[in-house]
């Protein structure tokens, strides 16, 4: 390919970029499983190591709405989480899909340059985010911390960000299973859910000593209260701490999403180059997986962050108030939207709150379902999964839809794929709303991300590890 290209700009940086060397031969499944475990262990350790030099990490968290989705843990080395990787990946996917950068993924040099450019951008994002976090006072006033401590904090965050990038690359290049992004997000969510279910810590907020974990609290209340009926009601519906109803709702959503993963349309296809039995091309209900809810969550979370920062700086400005006004709730330091655009796209914190403000609830449902459907249909166009792209792949591989002419594949796919993408995106959005209204142990977005990721790992293990029959098939057959 002749001429100058944007990707050529990264060539001078290639020798200086940290890199995981690809394996010379395919790594055995057991070894990949081991490296996945090692990667996960490193992530968990980094999530618990506090940043050295911070003065304080108390008070309202402007990134509260993004923490679980980005596998971020405040005040630790995993402060940035997977944010640099996700942001860089989405930007370059968009640039590639819209043809703003030219790259031939079948060409190894192009592919390597594209990955290097994406990695370089992720590192630059880590530097930028770390600098902004420190200078905006997330760990204390910069003037009080001093230049040396501020620089040390930035270096810690950037170093941790580079480690996460390399851990993700380690898995992506075949040493482990799946990707670091999915693994870290699912682990972070599962850790939070497990803690809220079984935490042995106690708190006293006016009703005596209570256990934080829903299951532990259930047994404690049944054992310590004489009125067992009242104890059960308290364990299932207490509002100030995780309860059993939330845990059951979380398990129900997990099973429901696994069941819905089995919904698909299977198109019979055959090869024009050789004779043989028909194959099947599956088009799933969740055609774009969890991408719609990730994009919707990223959009609303960024609105929350911008609105909250503007409100703290200019609380009386009319335009800032239109975007959103914020206030704390009783017993919590975290700020929540109380009016403006941010209020109407903020999920209700309980089913009772949803009933008390039906207009806000209706607007929120329309926003989530509509945005997920739009993001899903848009994503297939920029990610190479549109009807035209799939029809092109069929042609290149010598495949046709059984019972149709070679030239009719695009028309048949156009009838199915956009509908599946839009309906699947709206379904993901509806499940997220259901999670938020039912008060699952974690936001709707984070629960869906973890379930789809865990199921993806199950399918990968079933395919590469030689496991037996799909759980979805048996679950669907049982129902």
Swiss-Prot record:
Gene Ontology MF terms in the entry: peptide transmembrane transporter activity; protein-transporting ATPase activity; signal sequence binding
Membrane-spanning residues: 34-54, 77-97, 120-140, 147-167, 247-267, 362-382, 416-434, 441-458
GO cellular component, one term: Sec61 translocon complex
The UniProt record lists the keyword Transmembrane: yes
GO biological process, one term: misfolded protein transport
Localisation per UniProt entry: Endoplasmic reticulum membrane
Residue ranges, Lumenal side: 55-76, 141-146, 268-361, 435-440
Intrachain disulfide bonds: none
Cytoplasmic side: 1-33, 98-119, 168-246, 383-415, 459-479
InterPro entries reported for this sequence: SecY/SEC61-alpha (IPR002208), SecY_CS (IPR030659), SecY_dom_sf (IPR023201), Translocon_Sec61/SecY_plug_dom (IPR019561)
Main location: endoplasmic reticulum
Recorded topology in the membrane: Multi-pass membrane protein
Keywords: Endoplasmic reticulum, Membrane, Protein transport, Translocation, Transmembrane, Transmembrane helix, Transport
Pfam families named among the record's database cross-references: Plug_translocon, SecY
Top-level taxon in the UniProt lineage: Eukaryota
Family matches, as PROSITE patterns: SECY_1, SECY_2
Keyword Endoplasmic reticulum: yes
Subunit and interaction comment: Heterotrimeric complex composed of SEC61-alpha, SEC61-beta and SEC61-gamma.
Function comment: Appears to play a crucial role in the insertion of secretory and membrane polypeptides into the ER. It is required for assembly of membrane and secretory proteins and is essential for cell growth. It interacts with other membrane proteins required for protein translocation. Upon binding to SEC62/63 complex, secretory precursor polypeptides may engage SEC61 to begin membrane penetration event. A cycle of assembly and disassembly of SEC62/63 from SEC61 may govern the activity of the translocase.
Family per record: Belongs to the SecY/SEC61-alpha family.
NCBIfam families with a match to the protein in the record: 3a0501s007, PRK08568.1-5
Name assigned to this protein: Protein transport protein SEC61 subunit alpha
Organism per entry: Debaryomyces hansenii (strain ATCC 36239 / CBS 767 / BCRC 21394 / JCM 1990 / NBRC 0083 / IGC 2968)
């Amino acid at each position: 390919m002749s001429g100058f290209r944007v990707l050529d700009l990264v060539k001078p940086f290639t020798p200086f970029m940290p890199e995981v060397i690809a394996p010379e031969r395919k790594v055995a499944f057991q070894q990949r499983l081991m490296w996945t475990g090692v990667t996960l262990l490193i992530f968990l350790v980094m999530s618990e190591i506090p940043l050295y030099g911070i003065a304080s990490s108390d008070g309202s968290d402007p990134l509260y709405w993004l923490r679980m989705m980005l596998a971020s843990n405040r005040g630790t080395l995993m402060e940035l989480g997977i944010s640099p990787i996700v942001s860089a990946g989405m930007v370059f996917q968009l640039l590639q899909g819209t043809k703003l950068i030219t790259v031939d993924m079948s060409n190894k040099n192009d592919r390597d340059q594209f990955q290097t450019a994406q990695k370089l951008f992720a590192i630059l994002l880590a530097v930028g985010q770390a600098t902004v976090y420190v200078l905006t006072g997330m760990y204390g006033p910069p003037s009080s911390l001093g230049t040396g401590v501020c620089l040390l904090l930035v270096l810690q965050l950037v170093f941790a960000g580079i480690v996460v990038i390399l851990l993700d690359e380690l898995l992506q290049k075949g040493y482990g299973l799946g990707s670091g992004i999915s693994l870290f997000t699912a682990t972070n969510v599962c850790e939070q859910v497990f803690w809220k279910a079984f935490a042995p810590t106690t708190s006293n907020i006016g009703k005596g000593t209570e256990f934080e974990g829903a299951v532990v609290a259930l047994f404690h209340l049944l054992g310590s209260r004489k009125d067992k009926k009242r104890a059960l009601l308290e364990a299932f519906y207490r509002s100030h701490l995780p309860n059993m109803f939330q845990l059951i709702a979380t398990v129900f959503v997990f099973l429901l999403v696994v069941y819905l993963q089995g919904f698909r349309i299977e198109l019979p296809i055959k090869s024009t180059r050789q004779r043989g039995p028909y194959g099947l091309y599956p088009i799933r209900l969740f055609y774009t997986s969890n991408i719609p809810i990730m994009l919707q969550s990223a959009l609303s979370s960024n609105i929350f962050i911008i609105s909250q920062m503007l409100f703290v700086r200019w609380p009386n400005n009319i335009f800032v108030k239109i975007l959103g006004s914020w206030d704390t709730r009783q017993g919590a330091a975290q700020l929540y939207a109380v009016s403006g655009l941010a209020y109407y796209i903020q999920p209700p914190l309980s089913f009772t709150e949803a009933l008390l403000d039906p207009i806000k609830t209706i607007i929120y449902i329309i926003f989530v379902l509509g945005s997920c459907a739009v993001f899903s249909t848009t994503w297939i166009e920029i990610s190479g999964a549109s009807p035209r792209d799939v029809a092109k792949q069929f042609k290149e591989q010598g495949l046709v839809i059984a019972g149709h002419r070679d030239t009719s594949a695009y028309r048949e796919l156009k009838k199915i794929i956009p509908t599946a993408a839009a309906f699947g995106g709206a379904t993901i959005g509806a499940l997220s709303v259901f999670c938020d209204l039912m008060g699952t142990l974690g936001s709707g977005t984070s629960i869906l991300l973890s379930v789809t990721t865990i199921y993806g790992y199950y399918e990968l293990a079933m395919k590469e590890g030689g496991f037996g029959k799909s759980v979805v098939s048996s679950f669907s057959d049982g129902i």
